[in-house]
């Protein structure tokens, strides 16, 4: 059990069962230390924040700070990753992965402001989040102690946590009936557990929270025009908005048409495979818009580099290395490529799909005169022969050498 001397500790608090139990547990096991509850508002469900300060105080916290990070989350964390085209293992838009460094950074800043000597999170010992939180803590405030209750206590079940709170007369609205584990922010919502623990069991409707089932979506497609400047979405249907505002507008459209659902088995950083259902409606539309502009403005080599860049960025962000030099280096490359990614894209939303059907950009490299197959073709076909001979020279040499043997 605890051996460190801690007088004041800042807890990343969600108001859920786990972190509600952590508050009294910290006071009992760390010398009746002062526990400060920190709540990051990153666009999670509004009902999760109602009365959260009172809930923290009833659990024994000395105070509770709720910090609005919604715009910061989208502008400074989501948009930079979106520029790179990062998709973890080809499909996951990194909703939880991008949020954790921001939460941990704001938590560290509050701890330093209040003169705390320790930080605490409620991530389990099997998941990725413990790594993401603590890697950020180490990068920004290595002098602060870190407490991870799930790696210390013997409360291993939901029932044990409920009994723990009941024994201390701490009220909670949690029950034993919870089946799924969910994480939500402005960008996405994830669902794990329950029926999803068997990869052979299809996800049922309870696994989806935000989005309409594609087969039940409207029978008529809906078109949305997305404005992009330097790799960032700046307007929806001609209306300029903040990053968070753009996401809210696209989320509303995407959920109605069942856009942004994925059901995947992913490789966790800690070596365990896990299955989850992710819903990222607005983000999926944004990704389609950016890729549409990229098709016009990036040459072949730049596009291939962006593909490699996105893959590497996905691993760095997923692993929680947001403040590492590698992530910053990758970001510089992504920003350079995105400098030309400006334009407008019309996205068709229909039965779970978001398809770019019209696109334009002042930086477009697409030239109709060169692309046409008509008689007014400005491309001299005879030039292709010399290019092909040089392009295939290594193959020719290899074949000639083989013939001599």
Swiss-Prot record:
Its EC number is 6.3.4.5. L-citrulline binds at residues 92, 97, 128, 132, 181, 190, 266, 278. One of its GO terms (cellular component) is cytoplasm. The keyword ATP-binding applies. It holds the Pfam family Arginosuc_syn_C. It catalyses: L-citrulline + L-aspartate + ATP = 2-(N(omega)-L-arginino)succinate + AMP + diphosphate + H(+). Gene3D superfamilies: Argininosuccinate synthetase, chain A, domain 2 (3.90.1260.10), HUPs (3.40.50.620), Single helix bin (1.20.5.470). One of its GO terms (molecular function) is ATP binding. Pathway: Amino-acid biosynthesis; L-arginine biosynthesis; L-arginine from L-ornithine and carbamoyl phosphate: step 2/3. It is an enzyme of class 6 (ligase). Keywords: Amino-acid biosynthesis, Arginine biosynthesis, ATP-binding, Cytoplasm, Ligase, Nucleotide-binding. Belongs to the argininosuccinate synthase family. Type 1 subfamily. HAMAP family: Arg_succ_synth_type1. Homotetramer. This is Argininosuccinate synthase. It comes from Edwardsiella ictaluri (strain 93-146).
